[in-house]
């Protein structure tokens, strides 16, 4: 039996499946699976999902909103709802919070989680977050992530994790965050299963993982997925060629560009290891030295030490410090700048002037490798400081970027490969309804349900 209930007045709901929830249901029975979309049903970023099986409830991610977000639930309100007012609408105590990866829109509210609730992440994510927040000055995050904090617990992708009435299997998946994870949940009471996709894509160096995961679930573990919770970031974004570049394409384009332009700044997230690898190896192919500040150098060393153990793909050339750039004033060099988000205009100007004068001809080019929405004044996420910096280069800007999320074709293939049996619930998207128009079998289109933030989906 399936029932849906919501925190809002059900009489005003338009969807038939949601109106049916007006029938009273006992959502405290041990044989009931509950999924609560606290935030993410109608927005990108700030994702928080709750899964309850038996007497055990966990959150997946606890993220802050993205810059310029116009979501209906603010960070402060969501914290109060989940943690302060919790017992007003559920008897289930939270047994833990699991994090899919280290991006701020998935971990940004981690320091607001009550201290009696355990936190789970894989060891790579923990190492990266510790390195990141050593440089941010966020004391609360630094203390939470310290090695002496026993509430931080690590898991290993592919190995069973048991929390109360749940068995959980994490799966490594390709994303613009290194070592992102999907989670397969199984009730130890009813054997109901839920696959939470987290963020994923099919264009990175580890893209084969997207094909492997469904096979592992069905063949190695012998499981079928009842409910698929899947991201849909790209459902409202263009799918033209610039969004469909693979990391192999990024490396190829960068290699060709560097052949003709030997002094280049690169704007790319300092935690996007795949793309940083692409640019560093493109520079190596052209025998151009690579420079970065101490933060970039440390992050690349952390990434390379972890990933380099498994494949030579992530072996990087030596990265020189900015001081060496200043002293040498080279004729050629690739300078990794990070993302440059959230800077004031004057900071952007001074950074350009300082770094460009370290180059001999003072006419460097720029590779911009991030989402273009940050540069558009019409977009809520517009970053004036970043846009100011980019404008200084005029026509000497080259856009080379591989999207961090799955496009519609990849989403459709993933859904059919997973082959869920009951529901498909879109998350991390502004176009959940678009899932019904994906090129998937009709039976899967009929499984798509469109809850609002705060709705609870339950079945026995």
What do these predicted regions represent?
Residues 3-96, 105-274, 278, 285:
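His/Asp/Glu-rich metal-coordinating catalytic cores
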Residues 105, 155-161, 176, 272, ...:
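Short acidic loop-to-helix transition motifs that present clustered carboxylates
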